[in-house]
Amino acid sequence: MSRSGRSKSKYLNINIDDVHPETGNYIADCGGDMERGVFKYLLKLIEEFPKIKVTLFVTPNWIDKPNDPILIKLIKKVLGLKYTNEWKDEPFRLDKHIEWCEWLNELVRRGNVEVAIHGLYHHRNSDPHSAEFLGLSYEECITRLLNAERIFETSGLKYVRGFRPPGWGVSEGLFKALKDLNYVFVSLDPLACEINVPRYEVSEFNSLINIPQNWDIKNGKIEEAFEILKKGNILSVKGHIQERYGRDKLNNGLTEESYKNVRKLLIRIEDEGLDLRFAKMEEIANDFRGEKR
């Protein structure tokens, strides 16, 4: 069940999916190239607008690979072969990239950034291949979440108890597992997840605080952002770390174009003198719980 409560504050949060240590030497720079790669656009925004707050959704053991061309995929299906692709030998497991984790920790220590959990593998063995938790049982969800946390702990990467489901794949077992493991917030898209939660409001969902996404980092229009703030209490600026991943085009990655779009939004907000609180998702969730007491 979802329960909305109009918060006294209006918030702005920037949130980025699919962050993991993969570099441009593989399929795409997914954050692994650090300040030399796509992260430079986020760092430029933080330098220009030091009040902004960012939630990075990190996958601790990314094994997902893009789909094959349709014909090859169909042939694999007909032959009864595994038709989803994955990385072997877990090359992007966080505890294999301690230097990268420490670099992210430094961003966390500065106060603008938090790290939340974005699945364990970001992969499943059937379509849709990125919807990792789709249809999983409670026990399977508990196991994956605990394994994800274990990798975060061994890597030393600091994280908060927040979760966004990879590929928007969810199940009742997932929500019960998140509740029982004392997660603070979840971030769901009501349309993609087919779940009845508000798109423009922070709300309570299954004893978790849901913080939606509602404005595209690259394609969002400025007037649309102001309409969202009129309708609700949060402008949640959503993007991916990568613009495309092999054949999979995401079209809202960290690029020069998305940097310019968000910069234009932030300048307009300053010019209008809007009374917004820039906050990380954990801060928003804690505020919401405090106001409900």
Describe the role of every protein-language-model region:
Residues 1-162, 168-207, 219-237, 251-293:
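Catalytic alpha-helical scaffold of carbohydrate-active enzymes acting on polysaccharides/glycoconjugates
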